[in-house]
Regions:
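Active-site residues of response regulator receiver
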Residues: 19, 65, 96
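Basic, Lys/Arg-enriched C-terminal extension of HTH/homeodomain DNA-binding domains
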Residues: 207-242
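Recognition helix of helix-turn-helix DNA-binding domains
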Residues: 182-217
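Acidic, metal-coordinating helix/loop segments flanking the phosphotransfer/catalytic sites
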Residues: 45-61
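Receiver (REC) domain active-site loop signature in two-component systems and cognate sites
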Residues: 68
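Acidic catalytic/metal-coordinating carboxylates
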Residues: 46-49, 71-78
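Short, flexible helix-to-coil linker/hinge segments that flank and couple to helix-turn-helix
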Residues: 104-109, 114, 119-170, 174, ...
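Short hydrophobic/Thr-rich beta-strand motif most characteristic of the beta2 strand and flanking loop
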Residues: 37-45, 53, 212
Length: 242
């Protein structure tokens, strides 16, 4: 991963862990609290408890398992973010052993900012927390490839209207399509022969015009608008959408 994330001097990233396995919660807590600049503010055994704890502990990032009793991680994510779409809402990083496409797409639509498998190396998990806390989006590379391949090839339902891109310029459409294909800002800049700062400007305008909370939601917009129907998946080695 090549994304440098700076949370500011002395900034502490507050993390809440939601997983139904006590050993997993303990392992994640030990890993996170061994790193300067991060602290675990709570641990939940199910989605309902995660929603309750978030209200009182104000985490920056929630590590959310998918399959949990009482309330699964996707529903918990939906409830957390449905009531608070501004910058104060926590960023949700889905962690699971399941890399099935329906989980990825549903999690992103629920508002998750990232999706990683539980066998991700510890250093990559810590990087992911920093990336998510900084407002970027992240998908495990293997998940990104499957998501792109699945939805680029999926036939468009006749009854489902495409998402409107009214007000989006031709150049912004190009950028949005490349975001949907898994490219980082640096890769988009190379692809379109633009300065990376220019790409960042286009991304910022897309976020505003499409009322997207973060880059993960731009990926969903690219699929729902039909931009990828005539394009194959791009080859990207990066899971971080920087």
């Amino acid at each position: 991963m090549d994304t440098a994330v700076n949370m500011g001097s002395g900034a502490m990233i507050r993390v809440l862990i939601a997983d139904d396995q006590a050993l997993v919660r303990g392992a994640f807590k030990a890993l996170i609290e061994a790193v300067p600049g991060m602290t675990v503010v709570g641990a939940a055994a199910d989605g309902a408890e995660a929603v309750e704890l978030c209200a009182g502990h104000d985490p920056d990032v929630v590590l959310m398992d998918v399959r949990m009793p009482r309330m699964d991680g996707i529903e918990a994510t939906r409830r957390l973010l449905a009531r608070d779409h501004d910058a104060t809402a926590p960023r949700v990083l889905i962690l699971t052993t399941f890399d099935l496409d329906e989980y990825v797409f549903t999690a992103l639509r629920a508002g998750a900012s990232g999706f990683l498998l539980k066998d991700t190396p510890p250093d990559d998990l810590l990087t992911a927390i920093r990336v998510i806390a900084a407002g970027e989006a992240l998908l495990a590379p293997s998940v990104t490839r499957r998501l792109i391949a699945e939805f680029a090839a999926r036939p468009e339902p006749a009854s489902s209207p495409r998402r409107s891109l009214a007000g989006v310029t031709d150049r912004e459409r190009e950028v949005l399509a490349l975001i949907g294909r898994g490219l980082s800002n640096g890769e988009i800049a190379l692809h379109l022969h633009l300065a990376q700062a220019t790409v960042k400007t286009h991304v910022g305008r897309l976020l505003a015009k499409l009322y997207a909370r973060d880059r993960a939601q731009l990926v969903i917009a690219a699929y729902e608008s039909g931009l990828l129907n005539d394009q194959g998946p791009a080859s990207s080695s990066l899971g971080v959408f920087a």
